Each structure stands twice: as C-alpha cells, then as structure tokens.
C-alpha cells in the first residue's frame, strides 16, 4: 500500500511478465507516492491477478519446485490448452536475458570526491548499486554486457564489478571469456549474484539450476571462518 514513485525505481521499467497478489490494498498510503501500483501496472501493460491463495501457491512451489506459469482470463481455452500455451514459453535453463536488460550506452555515476574508479559490467544492474558505490567515493562507469576486455582496460579502472541480472549463467560464454581475459591481466574483479556466478565460471567452476530458488530477506548462511550464522537476502535461481 506504499504506492509508486520514480525515486525508488531500480530500473526504467517493470521486467516481470505477470504479477500475482492475494489482497491488493485499495488505498495508497505514503506521502512520497505519485501513483498506485495498479495504475503503474496498467501503464506498463503488465498482466496482474488478485484473489489468489498465494500461501497455497507457495506451498505448491515449495514441494514441486519453480515452474513456468500463465495468467489467463475468459473461457476461450480449456485447462489442457492453457497448459500447452504455458509450455511454449522458454524455460529459465538456457535463457540468455542480459541482452534485454543491459544498458545500450555507457554512463558514469560520479561521487562527490573520487577515491577509486570502477567499471560495472551491466548484466541487469539495479539503479541503487552505482549510487551506493558513489556514496562511498567510487566513480562508476556502467558499460553494456558485451563490452570487450580491451575496452574495459582502456578505461584504466581500479577494479571491475560484475552486476546482478537474470538468466542462465551457462549461456554467457562471451562474458565469461571477457572476465578470463581481465583476470589474466590481473585486474581486480568482484561481483554479486549473477555476476558472482559469471566470475565462478571464468575461474573454472560450473553452475546449475536450482529446483527451489533461494528467495527472501532471511536466508541463513554459515560463515565457516567464524562459525557464526548470518541472516542474508537472496534472490537467485542458479548456484
């Protein structure tokens, strides 16, 4: 019920194909809101449905794993025909999505005072990420996913950041090759989420699709150095 505003957007558009909610709030209750969720979904032509037992849906996915799904209206199609339509959609395994979400042109996010310079390879980067770097004195040059190692090195960065993003890391052979070339040049590289998996593949590791994706803000992770369990936020379907 917090509504919608342009300041908090992590991207210039909604990327999900559909939205499911049990009980949508009939009111928007936040002083920063400039529109409501329903209005924004309509503006961006995102299919949405309410009145769904999302708890039962969650239990179903918990027991059977992530799966393709469709949202249908009307009675033109039978249940069997709906299933056929859903199965036409591409599975996440083998999906190459970086080209759809990456920036087309490079751009720079400047800090008040520059301590370091980092090149961020945009595999689906969130808007808050370069802003967070800038708040810490890091000048960030965000570049398209298909930027070459030579083009990155020409910017003379102190490090290269591999962003988060959607899709199957096993499809990113060209980006993996770029990262390997940068590693051979001893350029410091770090990544999160999808970018972390790309870095792993560049170092010779394999990735695979999880039957149950890790989603949520309360995922426990054991730090083997300290023996302590940290509560972390996860949102990934591959490991």
Feature names for model-found ranges:
Residues 1-150, 154-155, 169:
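RNA-binding accessory domains that recognize and position tRNA/RNA substrates
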Residues 18-20, 70, 100, 206, ...:
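Generic structural signal for residues positioned in beta-strands
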Residues 26, 76, 228-229, 239:
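Generic "edge-of-domain/loop-turn" microfeature
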Residues 126, 237-239:
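Short Gly/Pro-enriched loop/turn and capping motifs at secondary-structure junctions
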Residues 154, 159, 163-237:
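Cysteine-nucleophile active-site neighborhood
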């Amino acid at each position: 019920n917090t509504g919608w505003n342009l300041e908090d957007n992590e991207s210039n558009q909604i990327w999900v194909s559909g939205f499911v909610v049990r009980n949508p709030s009939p009111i928007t209750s936040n002083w920063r809101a400039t529109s409501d969720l329903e209005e924004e979904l309509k503006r961006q032509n995102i299919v949405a449905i309410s009145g769904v037992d999302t708890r039962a849906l969650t239990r179903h996915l918990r027991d059977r794993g992530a799966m393709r799904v469709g949202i249908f209206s009307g009675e033109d199609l039978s249940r069997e025909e709906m299933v056929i339509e859903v199965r036409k959609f591409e599975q996440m395994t083998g999906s190459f999505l970086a080209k759809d979400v990456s920036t087309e042109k490079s751009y720079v996010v400047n800090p008040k005072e520059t301590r370091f310079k980092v090149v961020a390879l945009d595999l689906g980067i969130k808007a808050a990420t370069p802003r967070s770097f800038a708040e810490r004195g890091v000048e960030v040059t965000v570049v398209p996913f298909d930027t070459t190692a030579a083009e990155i090195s020409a910017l003379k960065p102190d490090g290269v950041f591999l962003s988060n993003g959607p899709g199957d890391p096993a499809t990113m052979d060209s980006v993996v090759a770029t990262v390997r070339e940068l590693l051979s040049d001893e350029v410091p590289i770090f990544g999160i989420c999808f970018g972390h998996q790309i870095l792993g593949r560049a170092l010779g590791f394999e990735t695979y699709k999880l039957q149950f994706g890790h989603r949520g803000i309360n995922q426990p992770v054991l730090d083997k150095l300290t023996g302590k369990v940290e509560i972390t936020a996860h949102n990934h379907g591959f490991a």
